[in-house]
Amino acid sequence: MRGDTKPEVCVIGLGYIGLPTAAIIARAGCPVHGVDVTQTVVDTINRGEIHIEEVDLDGLVQAVVQRGLLKASTEIAPADVFVIAVPTPFAKDGNHTPDTSYVMAAAEKVAEVLKKGDTVILESTSPVGTTEAMRDAIAAK
């Protein structure tokens, strides 16, 4: 990021948390690259439409897509700021243990394009220690 330019933001996970976050950041004038593993979600967003129920989000997404500030893809792209907003469902162990595998997979993908000075934000609901584990996974790359 240079001087007075807006940071480029990459939001990983375009569901109930990620898509509104991406749209609001884009409304502020930052170019946003949204990432989702589901191609139909990507295609829907790139048409300026939404795949979730959220009051007034449809108009906001349409506006920022039309302005060229929000683009979606299935691949992570270099950015100045990364927001990880992927699911953390319960594992199928019967103990309600959070499954952080989506977070760790996203962190490993971010590590592939991360450069000095970038910021990584974990927005996903996660148990204590997940941020440190994510940091360690990124540092190991």
Q: Model segments located where?
A:
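Glycine-rich Rossmann-fold phosphate-binding loop(s) that bind the pyrophosphate
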Residues: L14-G15
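N-terminal Rossmann-fold NAD(P) dinucleotide-binding loop
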Residues: G18-L19
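Rossmann-like NAD(P)(H) cofactor-binding subdomain of soluble oxidoreductases
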Residues: F90-K141
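Gly/Ala-rich phosphate-binding loop of Rossmann-like dinucleotide-binding domains
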Residues: A22, A26-R27
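Conserved N-terminal Rossmann-fold NAD(P) cofactor-binding segment
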Residues: R2-E8, P31, V37-V81, A85-P98, ...
